[in-house]
């Protein structure tokens, strides 16, 4: 099974990923964890360029770097893990590119989608959990943190476009992408995450 978590920066996504990993470990469920960009040696080098180096990247350059990282991790990590029937847990995957580079940066949605198909080789999560919060809430959370990468320092309008992109994706693919209210308590969100995970496991014919 392949499950991904999505959300705009400041949504609480990373907190929920951490809680879900703890849940899996408590229940002795083996899993492979990946994050985007990164997850491989090549991917981590690309992550450094994308998020922390002082390069002035054009949107097209940024998109292709994300795709390069994704192509590597799909073939090096995800496909081998799925072939071994392992659970794969991703902190961001292909939907991030559509939301951030497509809707956020204004690149062609069709082009981003085509590049996603090429970079993933058609590998798609069985379940994607989108932790949704209003942009003003997310920005307040980010401002409370001391460290910000280049993407987290984008404008309010940028994150509004990204959030709208995620919501559009969820409308188009409601069976895979589930929207979770990120303004609920951390505990309530985690409960819903686990509930949706177990339902998906059941649909796929797996048990805990």
UniProtKB/Swiss-Prot annotation:
UniProt key word Kinase: yes
GO CC annotation: cytosol
CDD domains for this protein: TMPK
Binding residue positions for ATP: 7-14
Top enzyme class: transferase
A GO MF label: ATP binding
Membrane spanning stretches: none
SUPFAM superfamilies (alphabetical): P-loop containing nucleoside triphosphate hydrolases
Gene Ontology BP terms: dTDP biosynthetic process; dTTP biosynthetic process; dUDP biosynthetic process
Entries under Gene3D superfamilies matching the protein: P-loop containing nucleotide triphosphate hydrolases
Keyword set, alphabetical order: ATP-binding, Kinase, Nucleotide biosynthesis, Nucleotide-binding, Transferase
Family designation: Belongs to the thymidylate kinase family.
Designated name of the protein: Thymidylate kinase
Protein species of origin: Kosmotoga olearia (strain ATCC BAA-1733 / DSM 21960 / TBF 19.5.1)
Gene: tmk
